[in-house]
C-alpha cells in the first residue's frame, strides 16, 4: 500500500528533497545504447551531483539478468490479450473475431491460448522473484535510479508500424525503446521521463525511478532538473 505523504504530490514540486543517494545506469545488457541517450543520461547525473545529490555508477543487479523476465512478460502479455478479448466479448454480447481487433492483438491472443498452466505459473514466479530482487537495491539505501528512457533516439515515422505480413513488427522492433522502462512495468514502481537532451532536434528522455510510494521524490527532483534545463524553452529546428 502506498504511504500517505500528507499532501498532494503536485505540492511537492519546488520542495527540497534533501541530499539523495542516486544510482546511474547508461548501458543495457540486451542492446546497444545510442551515444546521444547515454551522454544525456550521464550529463543528467552531473546535473544531479551539482544540485548536491550523491550520484554513483551503480544499479540493481536484477537489470543485468532480465532474459527470463522477457519470456515471462511475453507469456503474461499473451494471456492478458485473451482476457481482454473475453471481456470485450462480454460487452459486445458475442464472441470476438479477428475482424473486431487489430491483427497484432489477435495474434497475441492466439499465442496466449496456447500457454499451459505450468508456463503461466512459471511466468508469475519469475516476475515475483524479479520484483523482490529489484526491491533490495532501494532497501540498501538508494533513493533514485537514473537511466535513459529509451536506448535509441525517437523512431522515424512508420518504423514501428505493423504490416500485413508481420502484425507484431512494431512489438518486435520496440525492444530498444522499452528495455529501460519495461522492468518497472513489472515491478510497479513509480518512474518519470524527462526531456533532458536532444538528438537531431528531437527530444531524448531520461528516466528517474523511485521506490514504491515515493512519487514525491520524482516530483521534487523533476522540478529541480526542469529549473536547470528549462526544456520548455527549447525548440526543434523544424516545429509548428
Each predicted region: which residue ranges?
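Amidase signature
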Residues: 1-179, 186, 213, 224-240
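Structural detector of well-ordered beta-strand residues that form the stable sheet scaffold
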Residues: 145-147, 192, 209
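Short secondary-structure boundary segments
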Residues: 148-150, 194-197
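Short beta-strand->loop structural element characteristic of the AMP-binding/adenylate-forming
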Residues: 170, 191-193
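Short, well-ordered beta-strand elements
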Residues: 194, 202-211, 218-219
Amino acid at each position: 500500500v502506498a504511504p500517505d505523504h500528507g499532501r498532494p504530490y503536485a505540492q511537492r514540486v519546488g520542495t527540497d528533497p534533501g541530499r539523495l543517494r542516486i544510482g546511474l545506469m547508461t548501458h543495457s545488457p540486451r542492446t546497444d545504447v545510442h551515444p546521444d541517450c547515454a551522454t544525456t543520461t550521464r550529463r543528467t547525473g552531473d546535473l544531479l551531483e551539482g544540485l548536491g545529490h550523491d550520484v554513483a555508477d551503480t544499479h540493481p543487479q536484477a537489470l543485468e539478468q532480465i532474459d527470463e523476465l522477457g519470456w515471462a512478460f511475453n507469456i503474461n502479455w499473451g494471456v492478458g490479450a485473451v482476457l481482454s478479448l473475453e471481456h470485450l466479448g462480454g460487452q459486445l454480447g458475442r464472441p470476438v473475431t479477428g475482424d473486431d481487433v487489430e491483427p497484432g492483438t489477435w495474434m497475441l491472443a492466439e499465442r496466449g491460448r496456447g500457454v499451459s498452466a505450468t508456463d503461466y505459473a512459471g511466468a508469475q514466479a519469475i516476475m515475483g522473484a524479479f520484483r523482490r530482487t529489484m526491491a533490495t537495491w532501494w532497501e540498501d539505501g538508494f533513493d533514485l535510479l537514473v537511466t535513459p528512457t529509451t536506448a535509441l533516439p525517437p523512431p522515424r515515422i512508420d518504423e514501428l508500424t505493423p504490416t500485413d505480413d508481420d502484425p507484431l513488427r512494431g512489438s518486435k522492433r520496440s525492444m530498444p525503446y522499452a528495455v529501460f522502462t519495461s522492468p518497472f512495468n513489472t515491478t510497479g514502481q513509480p518512474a518519470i521521463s524527462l526531456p533532458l537532451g536532444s538528438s537531431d532536434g528531437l527530444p531524448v528522455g531520461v528516466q528517474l525511478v523511485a521506490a514504491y510510494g515515493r512519487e514525491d521524490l520524482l516530483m521534487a527532483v523533476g522540478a529541480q532538473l526542469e529549473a536547470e534545463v528549462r526544456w520548455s524553452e527549447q525548440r526543434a529546428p523544424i516545429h509548428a
